[in-house]
Amino acid sequence: MARRYDSKEAKRRILTACVRLFLEKGYTNTKVAEILKEADVSAGSFQNIFHTKDGVLTELISMMFSRQFGAVRPLAANAPSPVYLYAVETALQLAVTELSENLRDIYVEAYTFPATAEIIHRSTTAELQAAFSAYLPGCAECDFYEMELGTAGMMRGYMARRLSLIHISEPTRLLSIS
């Protein structure tokens, strides 16, 4: 008997399956066939909704980065400057990638794939502008976007290498740097 196609429900199942599989196996090691089996959807349904595995990652990154700074705001709520929010969020991303190879894989892919990287750039540009515009009053949004391109390149570089094996003896040191 053919499965009834409910795109919202299928999308939810695919996203749920991908979150679990990406965290368990990493982005690179998760195969589309595993996603289809876990989500109990057909290849056609998957392709109609997301087209590719990168399409799922784009959706997840969009959801995550729309909330990421908001989740960190309480940690920097009493800080004397909005710059602290940016510093805490940056340190948190680096620490998370040091603690989990599968999260490292997801973040590196997100900072590499053009569609997801653009989501990160746009989201972070707004945060950079909010944090640093008082210190850089002559900068326009495009200037903050260019700054984000540079910092994102550095972030990807640091995420792609296991820092604790190179220079850092404890991943928590990243949190104390900022």
Where does each model-flagged region fall?
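N-terminal intrinsically disordered/low-complexity leader segments
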Residues: 1-6
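Helix-turn-helix
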Residues: 13, 21-55, 59
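Amphipathic alpha-helical interaction segments
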Residues: 13, 88, 92, 146-153
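Hydrophobic alpha-helical connector segments
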Residues: 59, 70-103, 111, 121-123
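Amphipathic alpha-helical packing segments from all-alpha helical-bundle domains
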Residues: 109-160
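Single conserved hydrophobic/aromatic residue that forms the stacking wall/gate
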Residues: 166-177
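A short secondary-structure junction motif
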Residues: 43, 63-71, 96-100, 104, ...
